[in-house]
A protein has these predicted regions:
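Loop/turn-to-beta-strand initiation segments
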Residues: 52-53, 79-82, 103-105, 131-136
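Short, conserved loop/helix-junction motifs that constitute active-site signature segments
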Residues: 48, 96-105, 124-132
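Conserved pre-motif I regulatory segment
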Residues: 1-28
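Structural motif
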Residues: 28, 54-56, 84-86, 105-107
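Walker B catalytic acidic pair
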Residues: 109-111
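Conserved Walker A/P-loop ATP-binding site and its immediately adjacent core
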Residues: 33-34, 38-71
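Post-DEXD/H (motif II) to motif III coupling segment of the RecA-like Helicase ATP-binding lobe
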Residues: 113-173
Length: 179
């Protein structure tokens, strides 16, 4: 089995995460998309073979894809102590009162979904059934604005523009450069 070697930016995040978990039962890692957050999760599982991890994620495809990528990074390493469950499955188990796997560490990938009204109930159920588990969240963008909020802003902007045009004024919309 090959040892997972982290890139320097992930090693720093991993070291900080381990330090946080020594002092607290909850921690999070926020890094941009594509920078290797799943590799940090796998490293935690590899470095803690006596602990059971439950990874909550948005869909099976992402997990399967990440496991395939992991086989390129650490050939021969398949984390046997890492189970995967979608947020939707956790929600369904909460509704039915079904059994939740016991774990030492709950990992919430894309943890900004934990606050969603229905998926959040599933997360809470997992936590309640593993009261001593440490909880670790991973996300690229932990703050999300609801579609309602974005639509309201767009609607208000367009209404203001139409009102100004109605009175013969020219409307310019500010644009932010993405470069």
């Amino acid at each position: 089995m090959e040892e997972i070697e982290l890139y320097p930016h992930n090693q720093k995040a991993y070291d900080n995460l381990c330090a946080m978990l020594r002092d607290s039962n909850r921690a999070c890692v926020v890094q941009p998309t594509g920078t290797g957050k799943f590799v940090i999760i796998a490293k935690m599982a590899q470095d803690n073979p006596g602990k059971d991890f439950l990874l909550l994620g948005t869909n099976d495809y992402m997990y399967i894809d990440q496991m395939a990528n992991l086989s390129d990074i650490a050939p021969g390493f398949t984390p046997k102590n890492l189970q995967f469950m979608t947020y939707a499955t956790a929600m369904a188990k909460a509704r039915c009162g079904d059994e939740i796997p016991r774990c030492d560490v709950i990992v919430a990938d894309e943890f900004h979904h934990c606050g969603a009204p229905e998926w959040g109930k599933g997360v809470q159920y997992v936590v309640e059934n593993n009261p001593d588990a440490k909880i670790v969240g991973f996300s690229a963008t932990p703050i999300r604005y609801s579609d309602t909020w974005r639509m309201r802003c767009l609607s208000e902007t367009l209404q203001a523009a139409w009102s100004l045009r109605k009175h013969g004024l020219t409307v310019y919309f500010p644009c932010r450069s993405t470069s």
